[in-house]
């Protein structure tokens, strides 16, 4: 949960489950000198629930073997896309952005063998955790996306470290629970780009996508998205330019049917939220 909500979450959990054995992480528990002891308590204890902040959760390492496997999968994904483009456009065709991404991943893979564990902690896989619930899960939407689409807004190849860490831990839990064991709670699963829908599905139903033959973003985009090009004002405001954006859904009913296999969608109307009336009764153009 977000750091300010740890105490409230613990109180609510005990109110609902008064006989539960819970462990609540404090700021001191994750100080460098005490972190190893606290993580050992998780591994050796018999807890119904362990509550900690997003930043504390990230400090529990995932195994180097799992990181290596993910990097190899990403390198293979980019290599396949590059080969496909060269086959279509000729051997001299180069994709600088994707070649650069591949090189960075290979460097990460090379340095991984020399990377020591954070504080020599027990890894996440060794804790005995069998499920996870992430509050405000939209904080982990910034995953790196590898695509052969060039110069298209709405597709980011850079990702946040905490999102990659969450992805690896979710993959592990999905493997040991046959695709279950992960709960994301958020009011904004999609807020900035269409790619966020793909990211949510990657976290929660990766196996379902693969059963449909969707193993990477470009395959998902070909089924459920469309790139549109429009004339836009330049940043300087001195002229116009054509800009391509990945911003239009296709096959939306089919996509929502798939997503609803893992999503319990609640709209404002369904929740009957008490929203105050607008002053003046209508929006004001500023």
Task: Kindly label every feature range from the protein language model.
Residues 1-16, 22, 29, 34, ...:
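Conserved Walker A/P-loop ATP-binding site and its immediately adjacent core
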Residues 14-17, 66-70, 148-154, 199-203:
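Glycine-rich, phosphate-binding/catalytic loops in enzymes
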Residues 17-18, 263:
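A broad structural signal for alpha-helix termini and local helix breaks/kinks
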Residues 23-25, 286:
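General small-molecule cofactor/ligand-binding pocket signal
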Residues 29-32, 157-164:
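Conserved phosphate-coordination/catalytic loops
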Residues 35-82, 93-96, 100-131, 139-141, ...:
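Inter-lobe coupling linker of SF2 helicases/translocases
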Residues 87-91:
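Short, Lys/Glu-rich amphipathic helical modules
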